[in-house]
Design a protein with these regions (language model features):
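Extended catalytic cores of very large enzyme megasubunits
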Residues: 1-118
Length: 119
């Protein structure tokens, strides 16, 4: 199975939820472009830890895995990699201190994280 084999319903969901749009809501990204954006963003991280990393080769590997539908990252990664928000996690673990103040600080922090995730 490959990118050209995805169903009409899958394309509909990608267009509604995942692909980049301009300020008027017009699509400005293709499915292929989304996979390239995600692959480039994921590969670029390696250069932070290894100055000799071949990020182009890594990006091509990620891209091929995604376009062959052998591996797809989680929704936040597909939606946000390479974009301003950059939120790639689908869940958070927040510490909660054993006090009323600590509990409400945790609630506040959770609300702030959730708010950023839906921007």
């Amino acid at each position: 199975m490959a990118i050209e084999d995805i169903s009409e319903n899958a394309r509909f969901v990608l267009e509604k939820r995942y692909l980049a749009k301009d300020e008027e809501g017009n699509l400005i990204e293709t499915v292929d472009g989304m996979f390239r954006r995600v692959a480039d963003t994921m590969a670029a991280v390696d250069s932070k830890y290894d100055s000799t990393a071949d990020t182009k080769a890594l990006s091509d590997i990620f891209y091929e895995l995604m376009t062959d539908l052998k591996f797809l990252p989680n929704s936040p990664t597909l939606m946000n990699a390479g974009r301003t928000l950059g939120q790639l996690s689908a869940c958070f673990v927040l510490p909660v201190e054993d006090s009323m103040e600590g509990i409400f600080d945790s609630v506040k922090n959770a609300a702030l994280k959730i708010g950023r995730a839906h921007v």
